[in-house]
Amino acid sequence: MIPARDTIAAVATAPGRGGVGIVRVSGPRARAIAITLSGREPTPRHAHYGPFHADDGEVIDEGLLLFFPGPHSFTGEDVLELHGHGGPVVLDMLLQRCVDLGVRLARPGEFSERAFLNDKLDLAQAEAIADLIEASSAQAARNAVRSLQGEFSRRVHQLTERLIQLRIYVEAAIDFPEEEIDFLADGHVLAQLDGVRTELSTVLREAGQGALLRDGMTVVIAGRPNAGKSSLLNALAGREAAIVTDIAGTTRDVLREHILIDGMPLHVVDTAGLRDTEDQVERIGVQRALSAIGEADRILLVVDASAPEASDPSALWPEFLDFSPEPGKVTLIRNKADLTGEAIVLRCDNDGQATLSLCARSGEGLELLREHLKHCMGYEQTAESSFSARRRHLDALRLADEHLRHGHDQLTLAGAGELLAEDLRLAQQALGEITGAFSSDDLLGRIFSSFCIGK
């Protein structure tokens, strides 16, 4: 356990009023503070009900006091929890009393950071705490719990252990070249390397599903005024989220709705109609729409199928493609298909341009759109996803896979054992970034600073 230099405290419950509020303390002064506030020696891991006293003996609040001696606590240090009434004033008084007794206010994520530094959990498990708090669906919450319990870390450790054993074998073959047997050419190394790559591919696929359930994707609905953009937003949201009228330019700002499609979070953004206008407010709305288009994972370009104008995105709005750097991210939505009598169908041309005919008002074609959005993000409802993952985890897994692929080429094409050994080392280092075995202080600072205060 890393010795703590000071004692920290923070409110561990969400801001606002509630039935119960918790002040958490961690560090070497936790036990002394428990005695001072309650007037008695706390029994480890037992709940004590009683008053919490101010310096002059006045009762600040009454509630439960729990003391967890280190190293058998969340942070690995002595931890004190004060469970009082959930009013912000009362909690602030309790927190200030702790500060007066020699503690300092905790930074965001500092409790979890101390748990990580004291080997109570690894980096992936620490991130799972934040993922569980922020989960937007039941499946995402279940995945976060599995990661918190170590499922993701266990898979990464298994891969790392296989890499270590393979490195030992390869480096031994390099260090003893006088042996008559060419250990690099006997097929054992190649078989083991292929096995690790196969397992890594499986973990990467599951991590991709976990990341989708955690982050979802951002879908921007864009198009000319009166094309039916707001009607499409309402249809996807299942409620009247946006005002719908026959007046062009009704939507002048960006509207956001968060929905779920088979457990996958979808962040839908409705935008102002794209057109040249002299109205200053509407012009600002168009600029915000173009900004949202540039940041989208997927763009639904809505056109009025009953209008005679072209369905080519560049013809509908000349600047559109300038703000959408990847044309492949655009799905053309031919809305009001009920007026044209065209089939409700999804088509893809030779250039990969997807076009979907639907009717937002009646809901015809919406299920096709939902399936299309899941397909665009590679989400499979039936695919196994047993843990939560973040984009940095995917980047690390892909980097490890790239090193293993390169190492495979070095072995099979050049027989270069030294270069293979280096690629194995780099792959192991990439995996270590996930659990924190190889992590810079800058990375740790960025991760834990995004946590809630008190976590």
From Swiss-Prot:
Broad class of the protein's primary localization: cytoplasm
Note on cofactor: Binds 1 potassium ion per subunit.
Keywords: Cytoplasm, GTP-binding, Hydrolase, Magnesium, Metal-binding, Nucleotide-binding, Potassium, tRNA processing
Pfam families: MMR_HSR1, MnmE_helical, TrmE_N
GO annotation terms (biological process): tRNA methylation; tRNA wobble uridine modification
Family the UniProt entry places it in: Belongs to the TRAFAC class TrmE-Era-EngA-EngB-Septin-like GTPase superfamily. TrmE GTPase family.
Protein name: tRNA modification GTPase MnmE
Originating organism: Stutzerimonas stutzeri (strain A1501)
